UniProtKB/Swiss-Prot annotation:
Its cofactor is Mg(2+). One of its GO terms (molecular function) is metal ion binding. Belongs to the protein kinase superfamily. CMGC Ser/Thr protein kinase family. CDC2/CDKX subfamily. Pfam families: Pkinase. Residues 151-164 have a biased composition (Polar residues). Keywords: ATP-binding, Cell projection, Cytoplasm, Kinase, Magnesium, Metal-binding, Nucleotide-binding, Serine/threonine-protein kinase, Transferase. This is Cyclin-dependent kinase 17. InterPro entries: CDK, Kinase-like_dom_sf, Prot_kinase_dom, Protein_kinase_ATP_BS, Ser/Thr_kinase_AS. One of its GO terms (biological process) is anterograde axonal transport. Residues 99-111, 119-144 have a biased composition (Acidic residues). It catalyses: L-seryl-[protein] + ATP = O-phospho-L-seryl-[protein] + ADP + H(+); L-threonyl-[protein] + ATP = O-phospho-L-threonyl-[protein] + ADP + H(+). The active site is at D449. Binds 2 Mg(2+) ions.
Amino acid sequence: MTAYSPADSNAEARLLSGGSDPISDTENLLDLAYEVGTSSSDNTRYDRESENDEEEIGVGWEDTTSSSLNKRMCKSATFHDFCDDSEYSRRPVTTLHEEDFDEEEEDEFEDASDRRNLDEDDVEYEDEDDEDDIVVEEEEITPEDIEHSPTGVTTQTTPPSNNTSKSKKKKKRKSDEEDGLRKMKKSSTFASFLNMFVSRRRSGRDSGERLMSRSTCMLRPSISLSVVQESMILGSDGESVEVSPCTSDQTPTGVPPRYIVNVKMRQKTARKWSEEEIQKRLSLPADLRLPVAVVDKLNRTPTLDQPLTRKNRRASLSEIGFGKLETYEKLDKLGEGTYATVFRGRSILTNKFVALKEIRLEQEEGAPCTAIREVSLLRNLRHANVVTLHDIIHTDRLLTLVFEYVDRDLKQYMDSCNNAMQMNNIRLFLYQLLRGLAYCHQRRVLHRDLKPQNLLITAKGELKLADFGLARAKSVPTKTYSNEVVTLWYRPPDVLLGSTDYSTHIDMWGVGCILFEMIAGRALFPGGTPTEQLGLIFRTLGSPRPDRHPTICEKPTFYPYANRHYNPDPLCRQIPRIDAHGFELLMKFLQYEGKDRVSAAEAVKHPFLRTIAVKCCHLRDEQSVLEADGIHIERELLASDHHHSSRRHHRGTLVKDKYRMHSSHHT
């Protein structure tokens, strides 16, 4: 055994310096716990064996007075028991079940320390009281075990092992050594209480230190790291000012300043946004051209440079003037329907014409479902062959949809050219119609109301799908929809028979009817009622056959037509100027079974449209087909031209007849 260390002596002296109540000074107890835990291996333990070994310690028991002996023994027992109880506190906690831990045993453990302090003159306890005596088994603790603990005192404490002594032997101790041993027992009881008190105080602090050590262990000093932020501040020499994020050596988080990354500030350069960048950033339509004054105003808006959120986007659009009724001027009325009225207007922002679709809001029902569908679908469709929704204005009584203005539709276009369109223009319009439908079908949007009145034709010759009031998104799996869709002339036979289970093929039948009308100049199936419409279809295409058209023939509404047999009337006789490829594509559109109809994506690759598809296959969705090389609209022979041509032909005939009459008379 080695000699008793002076560090241990100082720690013991600090423990006993508090007088009769050493618990009052909490800081001294914590310091003592740290000294015990951080002592090196050279500071060896001091136990009862070292007290009794006169040769190793160097100080004999007989060299000291009786009072100093008692004080020294009391002091040694206190320090030893403190370390001994630290060893107990490092042991795992044994959790007892509620049924195993009796309240009577808990009271016995709490009152154990009081019973150890009984004087030697106390009366002898009864047999049932002798069972409450608790003797603490003290184990030795080595300095190596103490060094493994970070603080010397752990946060978990376990009650000392209870060995109930049932011995009835009560002898009076007469020697000073026996008296000192009894005081050592008292000190041992106090050490247990002291250890429990310190452990409870240390439990909260250790948890905070573990969190702090867990956070600081991830920090490493690095010279190569640097963060550059933008600022308008420059130094006196014209260079950027290097700013430290902390003004003192002590940071708020307790991290040393050497771990803080240096932040260099540089001058912020004002970025100027172009019109195309603003349109892309604010998701504006491609055909909407902002004036120069509006672009300059947006460049001065601080929200444009900030990260784009929904709130910042709305703020920027409001700065421009979107969402405000005063931005648009109402001019004249274009048409009126069940729920809405369409006006021609002018945008004060861009000084261009727009179409204002005013939807009346009922006080109880609110906005009609057709308007909600149209808004929800069009706001996500951005294509050159789909009409563009510019703005939405909501008031108490009206919901105004602002569209791009197109002055005529396909029906008006066919009437203007006396229903005799150029074949090149027919191919070009059909390709644009299929291109827009393929875009919508790819996004699982069904138009469900295709007709020439809903296909807008611009002055350049661009075709745009419009009036998505009956459109809806197709869900997966296929849902049942209403059969009261599509104008009667362009409604497929399965829908006429009451089918509500359909998909994108509902639009392809209407494409075939529109193609025939552009070529022939008249409607293919102009029925007045659903029954008359089905009769026209069966007489033209022939009666459905159960082996080839089971979906049609199994419908209960088909029974009145089951006994009627019609032979098909070849359509090629009605449209003689169409070629074989065009007629083949037309018949692929007009199929009884919806699954047999060609899709829009397949139709654009058909040989009838190959010359246009080759030149337009590289275009983006937002680009018009007229931007491709070699694609243009041919000049149509208008109705006025037909009238003037007939008058010239009539005048020429009169001149010839007059010349013949003059010649014969002269003869």
